């Protein structure tokens, strides 16, 4: 559903700001991309009722996010979990969910 775009983690990215070593990044571009993708999704429904949209959106965002972070950390789960702001056990559960373990 999304081009290159986790429950609490995504919420933090899209409505808050990301703290980096060099300062703060406001992820307006990510928010705009998600908004466009969800708008396009509903436009394509052609009057049909959508089911479980929340879970679908989260999984469509979470999977590529995890993939990119794991690449960035070269598979270091401790570093990845710290970057995401979640504990390593939660990260392992999410990686398993998406077949990335």
Curated annotation (Swiss-Prot):
Give the keywords, sorted.
Answer: Activator, DNA-binding, Transcription, Transcription regulation
**Which Gene3D superfamilies does the record cross-reference, listed alphabetically?**
Homeodomain-like (1.10.10.60)
What GO molecular function terms would the record report? Answer: DNA-binding transcription factor activity; sequence-specific DNA binding
Q: Which residues bind DNA?
A: 77-96
Does the keyword section mention Coiled coil?
Answer: no
Q: Which domain of life is it from?
A: Bacteria
The reply to whether DNA damage figures as a keyword in the UniProt entry is: no
Question: In this UniProt entry, which cysteines form S-S bonds?
Answer: none
The UniProt entry, under HAMAP family, shows: DNA_binding_Fis (MF_00166)
Outline what the protein does. Activates ribosomal RNA transcription. Plays a direct role in upstream activation of rRNA promoters.
Similarity comment: Belongs to the transcriptional regulatory Fis family.
- Subunit structure, briefly? Homodimer.
Please state what the protein is called: DNA-binding protein Fis
